[in-house]
């Protein structure tokens, strides 16, 4: 899995297109950096850039952007709706893939130190990189904004983490750090700025102060007026969308607005958003409205509609969801990106991978997909109206399992590659032999874990498949028969892939426990597949 860090620098310029473009070029021309999004706000006079790359690359990209900004932005002349204290106001580093939070903290520290040394400006650390509890949140550091800096920098409490304690009028100060994925989410209101701010105070965790906290944890908020759209916004930052979800903020803001008799007219996502945040919202609305929506594309479309994400500008998921913009290509091409003909050709080639493990995963995925198909060929037809609620319950497990099992096609090939890499390690000294042995054992654990997961996933499907066999559309009888044998065959393949990798493992307790588990899963698959086939034969008669 390739390492990927996201960097989201916020520069205090949202009107001068030449400056905005110059900073964009500085980032995109940095080797290893991919500029994903540039979101300029005229009223806020601020532009949010989003780019990704490996850790060392994003640090360089942020520095290149800062150098450019230092020549083009003069904070002494800056005015805008958004709180700010510097030309490069804030520059967070966020783990996206294959990177720990600790590694992002190192990115922030390296960037902060180099920025301070090169430009001779004050730099503060916040979030996970904060050196003191009082500097963990951005609003705490930014209190008083740019205008308060001359006096603030004289206070011992606010000595910068890097750089001088002197005021630099053209620059101000910069805050950098590491954090989880922050979602900038604004709810649109036909109201005054003051009414929007009143709602923000009720919602944000900080509330109106220590004695009057707000309702939503890990949420920052402010109300402002968006002149270019002629409406107000409750502007929020979701610091952890798994603590307070996107839809929770929207629904709570709408409830507050209703109490004030104010219309909510959609919302706006600034920058990029993780796929999970939208899928969580889709799950909420599907549950709330008792909707049956399976496909990821449709679930995202539902969320765009319910939140009104396209109310101010078109919302293109391919350009706004980070996983869609930066797929995990890794060093090898995904088997899932090849055609069926190409996959079969690769299996038949003179190479050990893809092998039986990948084929078992593909067969099981097809079995789950067939069961999903039978459910959908039953659902929504007038003669099966009485089965509507049953199909709504039975189809989703097969739909989800087919995606999970499909991902194991690649996972098995990667696990095999990890074992091969371990075998190739040098073994000339005792230390090298120990390192090689540890790497090989870890590789074997991965090679066991993938087929075991396959068998466990299929195990969860048997009850639903039994029920589907009793009531599914009989026109699809042969499809269900193939589904049952495909799922059984997938577990059959998983069983032998587990066994062949277990034999070289040294942990006897793990070997015995795993052998017992995979054996029971294989026996279950044989029994359950036979029962499904028997039920189908009985219905045919």
From Swiss-Prot:
Keyword Lyase attributed: yes
Catalytic activity: 5-formimidoyltetrahydrofolate + L-glutamate = N-formimidoyl-L-glutamate + (6S)-5,6,7,8-tetrahydrofolate; (6S)-5-formyl-5,6,7,8-tetrahydrofolate + L-glutamate = N-formyl-L-glutamate + (6S)-5,6,7,8-tetrahydrofolate + H(+); 5-formimidoyltetrahydrofolate + 2 H(+) = (6R)-5,10-methenyltetrahydrofolate + NH4(+)
Keywords: Cytoplasm, Cytoskeleton, Folate-binding, Golgi apparatus, Histidine metabolism, Lyase, Multifunctional enzyme, Phosphoprotein, Transferase
Subcellular location: Cytoplasm, Cytoskeleton, Microtubule organizing center, Centrosome, Centriole; Golgi apparatus
Disulphide-bonded residues: none
Positions of modified residues (Phosphoserine): 520
A Pfam family assignment: FTCD_C
Molecular function, one GO term: folic acid binding
GO cellular component: centriole; cytosol; endoplasmic reticulum-Golgi intermediate compartment; Golgi apparatus; Golgi membrane; plasma membrane; smooth endoplasmic reticulum membrane
Binding of folate, residues: 163-172
Pathway(s) this gene product operates in, as recorded in its UniProt entry: Amino-acid degradation; L-histidine degradation into L-glutamate; L-glutamate from N-formimidoyl-L-glutamate (transferase route): step 1/1; One-carbon metabolism; tetrahydrofolate interconversion
Region (Linker): 327-334
Annotated stretches, region: Formiminotransferase N-subdomain: 1-181
SUPFAM superfamilies associated with the record: Formiminotransferase domain of formiminotransferase-cyclodeaminase, Methenyltetrahydrofolate cyclohydrolase-like
Active site (UniProt): 82 (for formimidoyltransferase activity), 412 (for cyclodeaminase activity)
Region (Cyclodeaminase/cyclohydrolase): 335-541
Family annotation (SMART domains): FTCD, FTCD_N
EC annotation from Swiss-Prot or TrEMBL: 2.1.2.5, 4.3.1.4
Keyword Phosphoprotein: yes
InterPro entries in alphabetical order: Cyclodeamin/CycHdrlase (IPR007044), Formiminotransferase_C (IPR013802), Formiminotransferase_C_sf (IPR037070), Formiminotransferase_cat (IPR004227), Formiminotransferase_N (IPR012886), Formiminotransferase_N_sf (IPR037064), FormiminoTrfase_cat_dom_sf (IPR022384), Formintransfe-cycloase-like_sf (IPR036178)
Region (Formiminotransferase C-subdomain): 182-326
Function text: Folate-dependent enzyme, that displays both transferase and deaminase activity. Serves to channel one-carbon units from formiminoglutamate to the folate pool.
Record-stated family: In the C-terminal section; belongs to the cyclodeaminase/cyclohydrolase family.
Subunit structure comment from the entry: Homooctamer, including four polyglutamate binding sites. The subunits are arranged as a tetramer of dimers, and form a planar ring-shaped structure.
Protein name: Formimidoyltransferase-cyclodeaminase
Organism of this sequence: Mus musculus
Classification of source organism: Eukaryota, Metazoa, Chordata, Craniata, Vertebrata
Name of the gene encoding the protein in the UniProt record: Ftcd
